[in-house]
Amino acid sequence: MNDIEIADLYQELIVDHSRRPRNYRRLENATRQAEGFNPLCGDKVKVYVDLENDVVRDISFEGEGCAISKASASLMTETIKGKSKAEVEQLFSRFRHLATGTGDGSGLGKLAVFSVLRGFPARVKCATLVWHTLHAALEQTANIVSTE
């Protein structure tokens, strides 16, 4: 896929997932949760995870934010359902490297469209906030995560 095709797909996915986010709800039976905040953009997100035997049975999110953060959260929740904790951590690492320009989109599926953010550090924080929040929820390392 060339850069123009990726940019077109990015636009389409961001608009779709920000207007109609998937898994945007409070997960009542969550076994893990964490909150994230991006002071630069004002994004706030809460991630809920139902983790059983180290497998993500269900995941959801709530929050306010820009189109990029909401779309990233929506796409992330679709991508990681049914994945093991180890697989999720690998996806998080790949996504972070993709968004910051140190990796490619292999193995990321639709998430690869976020490669267009490489030249925009503030937007990278919008896209990765939910991933850092998920990591904190899975590892139970912090209740509130900040991009700063």
Residue ranges of predicted features:
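Short, thiol/selenol-centered motifs that function as redox-active sites or metal-ligating centers
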Residues: 63-71
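Contiguous, function-dense segments enriched for cysteine-driven chemistry
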Residues: 39-50, 55, 67, 97-98, ...
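Structured beta-strand/loop patches that form or line metal/cofactor-binding pockets in enzymes
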Residues: 20-63
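C-terminal binding/interaction regions
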Residues: 1-25, 83-148
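Alpha-helical support elements that line or immediately flank enzyme active sites
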Residues: 72-84
